[in-house]
From Swiss-Prot:
CC per GO annotation: cytosol
EC number: 3.6.1.1
Necessary cofactors: Mg(2+)
Gene: ppaX
Pfam families: HAD_2
Role this protein plays: Hydrolyzes pyrophosphate formed during P-Ser-HPr dephosphorylation by HPrK/P. Might play a role in controlling the intracellular pyrophosphate pool.
Catalytic residues of the enzyme: D11 (nucleophile)
Classification lineage: Bacteria, Bacillati, Bacillota, Bacilli, Bacillales
PANTHER family: PHOSPHOGLYCOLATE PHOSPHATASE, PYROPHOSPHATASE PPAX
InterPro entries in the cross-refs: HAD-like_hydrolase_sf, HAD-like_sf, HAD-SF_hydro_IA, HAD_2, HAD_sf, PGP-like_dom2, Pyrophosphatase_Ppax
Protein name: Pyrophosphatase PpaX
GO biological process: DNA repair
Gene Ontology molecular functions: inorganic diphosphate phosphatase activity; magnesium ion binding; phosphoglycolate phosphatase activity
Length: 217
């Protein structure tokens, strides 16, 4: 493989695996526990998907942000395996990229152990050489630190890399790291929301990546 794009970095939640119901139910339980007098609809919760937990909880309830983070993680882990789903075609596309010797990595705002749990449940763990979680960086996306760390570990350059995600934090992180970027049309907030951040590509299905990287050769 001698193409321009050699390295593909992925967000996890909402990109590779469908954790939307898990995330929404976990937020609902956390908010009910700490803010029982306030009503949060699913639509209210959608903006919380993407930023780090502390960023979200400090904005909602700064006095109890750390307690909310702990409660969220405990609830999330308890219900994790029952509520995550695979997106159609993701496994096959990632396997094809792996078999064609592309360098594959994860850059997520989740903790490393939780990322690995999701990857193992869906059987994707064997395809990724590098996994960067929130506990491995000082600055979460959209800061480019995680992407730059992944590229260094993969011995890759920004010029040959693309960042793929379902949230503006992913697209902005890629732009800040000066890689190519791709949004996914199956993002819970919708492709129109993601398009306003001007990713270089918009994937209708994960297999679209195969055409993109082959076209760059």
């Amino acid at each position: 493989m001698t193409g321009k794009i050699t390295t593909l970095l992925f967000d996890l939640d909402g990109t590779l695996i469908n954790t939307n119901e898990l995330i929404i139910k976990t937020f609902q339980a956390t908010l009910q526990e700490f803010l029982p007098d306030r009503v949060f609809t699913r639509e209210d919760i959608l903006p919380f998907i993407g930023p780090s937990l502390m960023e979200t909880f400090r904005e909602i309830n700064p006095a109890h942000a750390e307690e909310m983070r702990v409660f969220y993680r405990e609830y999330n882990l308890k219900h994790h395996d029952d509520l995550i789903l695979e997106y159609d075609g993701v496994y096959e596309a990632i396997r094809a990229l792996y078999e064609e010797d592309y360098k594959l990595g994860i850059v997520s705002t989740k903790m490393y152990d939780t990322i690995m749990r999701g990857l193992k449940v869906t059987g994707l763990d064997k395809f990724f050489q590098v996994v960067i979680g929130l506990d491995q960086v000082s600055n979460a996306k959209p800061d480019p630190e995680g992407i730059e760390m992944a590229l260094s570990l993969l011995n890759a350059t920004k010029e040959e890399a693309i960042m793929i995600g379902d949230n503006y934090h992913d697209i902005e992180a890629g732009k800040n790291a000066e890689t190519l970027t791709a949004g996914v049309a199956w993002a819970i907030k919708g492709p129109e929301h993601l398009a306003q951040f001007q990713p270089d590509f918009m994937l209708e299905k994960m297999s679209d990546l195969l055409a993109i990287v082959r076209d760059e050769e």
